[in-house]
């Protein structure tokens, strides 16, 4: 995790908890390496911080097959579309919208490059980051129904939360180092 160690060191003091959590959540546990790193890649892509994504990709590529990384990136892209669409349908609350066909291509959900169940777990984690209740419920039902334990789901969402927080903390790092306008004027 050399690339992520550099990211952790770049996090400012206000993000000390995130620095510690970023190391902890990626340690071996109930998730397989493919699940752990796939969730990290997918949620880093969803967080849209290039520096964090590059570091997680570097470390993930050293740990898992290329197909896992491809699926994780595909999950982030597909969920960027689906989370907006299905969150809208849920939020507006009109049955008429829910009755309309989505007519959006989602072939990668059906035919991932690696494991279908792992792809669903990546999609669940991204959906949690993006705040789509409908997608979270749907993907959680699929993965648990497919044999993924609630402990594994819980760990995936913990990774998602910490990766998202790390992206925010990296943005803070640039602001924490710069003096405030009020201090500069005083």
Swiss-Prot record:
<feature type="active site" description="Cysteine sulfenic acid (-SOH) intermediate">
    <location>
        <position position="135"/>
    </location>
</feature>
<dbReference type="GO" id="GO:0015036">
    <property type="term" value="F:disulfide oxidoreductase activity"/>
</dbReference>
<dbReference type="GO" id="GO:0008785">
    <property type="term" value="F:alkyl hydroperoxide reductase activity"/>
</dbReference>
<dbReference type="GO" id="GO:0051920">
    <property type="term" value="F:peroxiredoxin activity"/>
</dbReference>
<dbReference type="InterPro" id="IPR003779">
    <property type="entry name" value="CMD-like"/>
</dbReference>
<keyword id="KW-0676">Redox-active center</keyword>
<comment type="similarity">
    <text>Belongs to the AhpD family.</text>
</comment>
<feature type="disulfide bond">
    <location>
        <begin position="132"/>
        <end position="135"/>
    </location>
</feature>
<keyword id="KW-0575">Peroxidase</keyword>
<dbReference type="GO" id="GO:0045454">
    <property type="term" value="P:cell redox homeostasis"/>
</dbReference>
<keyword id="KW-0049">Antioxidant</keyword>
<keyword id="KW-0560">Oxidoreductase</keyword>
<dbReference type="GO" id="GO:0032843">
    <property type="term" value="F:hydroperoxide reductase activity"/>
</dbReference>
<protein>
    <recommendedName>
        <fullName>Alkyl hydroperoxide reductase AhpD</fullName>
        <ecNumber>1.11.1.28</ecNumber>
    </recommendedName>
</protein>
<dbReference type="InterPro" id="IPR004675">
    <property type="entry name" value="AhpD_core"/>
</dbReference>
<comment type="function">
    <text>Antioxidant protein with alkyl hydroperoxidase activity. Required for the reduction of the AhpC active site cysteine residues and for the regeneration of the AhpC enzyme activity.</text>
</comment>
<feature type="active site" description="Proton donor">
    <location>
        <position position="132"/>
    </location>
</feature>
<dbReference type="InterPro" id="IPR004674">
    <property type="entry name" value="AhpD"/>
</dbReference>
<dbReference type="GO" id="GO:0006979">
    <property type="term" value="P:response to oxidative stress"/>
</dbReference>
<dbReference type="InterPro" id="IPR029032">
    <property type="entry name" value="AhpD-like"/>
</dbReference>
<dbReference type="Pfam" id="PF02627">
    <property type="entry name" value="CMD"/>
</dbReference>
<keyword id="KW-1015">Disulfide bond</keyword>
